[in-house]
From Swiss-Prot:
Gene Ontology molecular function terms on file: nucleotide binding; RNA binding; RNA-directed RNA polymerase activity
Cofactor(s) needed for function: Mg(2+)
Alphabetized Pfam families for the sequence: RdRP_4, Rotavirus_VP1
UniProt-recorded name of the protein: RNA-directed RNA polymerase
Gene3D superfamilies (alphabetical): 1.10.357.80, 1.20.120.1390, 3.30.230.140, 3.30.70.2480, Viral RNA-directed RNA polymerase, 4-helical domain
Organism of provenance: Rotavirus A (strain RVA/Human/Japan/S2/1980/G2P1B[4])
SUPFAM superfamilies in the cross-refs: DNA/RNA polymerases
Keyword annotations: Magnesium, Nucleotide-binding, Nucleotidyltransferase, RNA-binding, RNA-directed RNA polymerase, Transferase, Viral RNA replication, Virion
Source organism phylogeny: Viruses, Riboviria, Orthornavirae, Duplornaviricota, Resentoviricetes
Catalytic reaction equation(s): RNA(n) + a ribonucleoside 5'-triphosphate = RNA(n+1) + diphosphate
Stretches assigned to the RdRp catalytic domain: 501-687
Amino acid sequence: MGKYNLILSEYLSFIYNSQSAVQIPIYYSSNSELENRCIEFHAKCLENSKNGLSLKKLFSEYSDVIQNATLLSILSYSYDKYNAVERKLVKYARSKPLEADLTVNELDYENNKITSELFPTEEEYTDSLMDPAILTSLSSNLNAVMFWLEKHENDTAEKLKIYKRRLDLFIIVASTVNKYGVPRHNAKYRYEYDVMKDKPYYLVTWANSSIEMLMSVFSHEDYLIAKELIVLSYSNRSTLAKLVSSPMSILVALVDINGTFITNEELELEFSNKYVRAIVPDQTFDELKQMLDNMRKAGLVDIPKMIQDWLIDCSIEKFSLMAKIYSWSFHVGFRKQKMLDAALDQLKTEYTEDVDDEMYREYTMLIRDEVVKMLEESVKHDDHLLQDSELAGLLSMSSASNGESRQLKFGRKTIFSTKKNMHVMDDMANGRYTPGIIPPVNADKPIPLGRRDVPGRRTRIIFILPYEYFIAQHAVVEKMLIYAKHTREYAEFYSQSNQLLSYGDVTRFLSNNAMVLYTDVSQWDSSQHNTQPFRKGIIMGLDILANMTNDAKVVQTLNLYKQTQINLMDSYVQIPDGNVIKKIQYGAVASGEKQTKAANSIANLALIKTVLSRISNKYSFATKIIRVDGDDNYAVLQFNTEVTKQMVQDVSNDVRETYARMNAKVKALVSTVGIEIAKRYIAGGKIFFRAGINLLNNEKRGQSTQWDQAAVLYSNYIVNRLRGFETDREFILTKIMQMTSVAITGSLRLFPSERVLTTNSTFKVFDSEDFIIEYGTTDDEVYIQRAFMSLSSQKSGIADEISASSTFKNYVSKLSEQLLFSKNNIVSRGIALTEKAKLNSYAPISLEKRRAQISALLTMLQKPVTFKSNKITINDILKDIKPFFTLSEAHLPMQYQKFMPTLPENVQYIIQCIGSRTYQIEDDGSKSAISRLISKYSVYKPSIEELYKVISLHENEIQLYLISLGIPKIDADTYVGSKIYSQDKYRILESYVYNLLSINYGCYQLFDFNSPDLEKLIRIPFKGKIPAVTFILHLYAKLEVINYAIKNGSWISLFCNYPKSEMIKLWKKMWNITSLRSPYTNANFFQD
């Protein structure tokens, strides 16, 4: 098999290069004779290596194994207590180490001082400000780079230049790290005080970031950007990323649009050859000049020069360099501040009395009216979700922290835990569960805090509120989100849209008489001035709503919600500062409530409307669109005359003045051609995304394993690559090797092969070919998949003990009783399983499962166990289909223009041939009639897996299922007896298959699968009416064609002659497909 195994073998020789080191390849085969040879081969290898004999002879003796069997893993052992990293590093440490400038950052601890200067004693030390939070070490990262450098030192031509650029940058890192010695990590991949005390505090996180950057260098420009960022981020740990990325908000306003894509009435992207000139007032250039000056003051030279050079003609062709700088700036790593500073940040804005009360009044009223509009239908019709809001809240209760650790009893087991779900169970068992009382968060019970770190911004604090707040808000917020789903203004929630739709919406109305106003309101969201009008607006809305109903339960739901707002208007937080816990009154809005996203969107919409209504007194314009997307809002205004420099300047100043009247510290800009918001930016009529995901530093530690993190690393690499930031693939593969290896003893280590890591089993980590998800159909692939399925789910004694306790059982049966009107095993078992799965976030349980998983894996990687599984996977289905397809060459012309310039060539090619899609394919069954029927009468939300299982049951079983969830018998009868039911079977199967094939992830989400251009390459004669079979045949064909085109840059045409006799067999099989969860699918999901 591919490149991975080759690199793995080279990597092992590089790492274990002493006399005593041995590599033993382990093979397997689905052919039983060959399998026996594999076993023999392995036994003899072990025998020889124990006796210190060479393995060379065996390799030739068993050439049949090496040729025809599949590599399963490589067992490597070495008796070297290897400090190899230090030894190898010296070779590269040949320049002057960097010296940190200790005066750059305002906060003392953000300067890169020697650790013992920042933390004189071990008690004071914390790694929380520099913790890379990833389960791989600096020494591994250094090894991976040195491996790459050694492997490529004899490259020629263009490749040699890349080698030299990277070598040059690595010398800087190596020299600096070498001066202090490589910090050794402990078993949890953390860096302790005695390791760090004589080293610069930020050494590790800086080195990780630098390695990530230097391994992403290809061109000379990359080299200049990386060098500057590597050198300066050693000292500047606070403002560098912000300085470098600030100019983008203005740059997008400088590029003329010459042809662009716009959204048409059918919500598709359509090319428009319109020309829109960038009208830029001098004031804007002055602001840009100021930004470039600030960059130079901070020591930047090359980056401001690149921007300056680009300004000469502001062309879209050279804009990719600007996009590159913008993306690179995030890779300097996370800015991690102390909690106290993060909290005080929002509190130090001084409060002025000099505000426009009239505007605040309007703002509050707009919030009030929007809340009413969102909820009035549900309230007037006494919606069941609002009646059973408490149950709905419990069913979707998360297993995150509840803010305090408590001692809990489950049967005979006593545990202490902070998890919400466990606290709820415990409270119910002990009669302390009172969802009708929202605990205060005042000075008597201040709120514990979480944190959110992100590159280029300050640390933000997050409220960890008691679970009562979640229960009180859940149902109401869900209703608000349903409203937002079919309201175009809410770009983030708008039904099944993706970012391309939002892009077409903006460009649609740009013309010579329009301007677009875009504002970053993140400062406003967390400002004190916002909190009173914001909460009051919501409270007033809830009061109006409460008068629209006579249903006591609905009124109670609204009142509890109102109570959360009242409590939060008087909030105090607890912040650890050294050994003391400080309580401060915190008068601002922070994330952590269920309503955070929805309510912020409402407030931001109200804010931009308030501002627009103000400036409409002075100008005459039509508002073509208003959008709010997270912390950003934007609006396109159309005037009756052509826009001039003076107009842009005046509107800009008036808008800023208007925001200032509300004391809103926001960055508001006006342009005629482009916008820049946190999620995306539009320049020259094209759409760009920031490729700013850090690979070798993480924001925080979770309870994911090394395997999970290897999959996340790969997934992050793919997203960055689609967005225009490419890291060397060999380096990424080397990291995957390191992170997926399993230590057996101190000197014994097992490295899984490519087949193990890329087959879609429960252990899948990456794709053997970027952007292409392959479903193996060869005998060996299916064999290994089965083998892994046999050991997929691991038991945990602690989890079993907890779920056997009365506390747990009573909780689950209480939920079932409240939910169900009659017995329903599927749902009861579902709830029990969901609750049991939530226990996984309790560390001892996940550790126990991990250990079991590792030991099962170790057995499997040394000798796969044949397991006759009767489970059918998507691979089996595709294996059945594959033989009936014949392939021939075809040609598709490139007919669409580029609109996403950062895409890799091969992905871009597909889009230019078949077009793109602006919607998400429905893959959760929510559009099916049965799902809608259930949500009409019950708060229960079945998953796509459950719907798939239910819809294939007998009709009377489906009726019972529905009736047990409270659906009236007449409705259940009508459903089962109607055509809709058979349409649902098809629709749910379709959703389920889309879900299995990850059609909304990676680069597949960009392609138009219903493109006529794609359809015409596929010929499948119609035989018999089995739509599900027709569907799977077509989808398989489309994926084959697209995958072939990604790989080869050319098109094929497929013809399928599927025998009618096989169709029924296939159809039956399609109702038994097992879905596989793997680190890979979790990483995809995590991207969402």
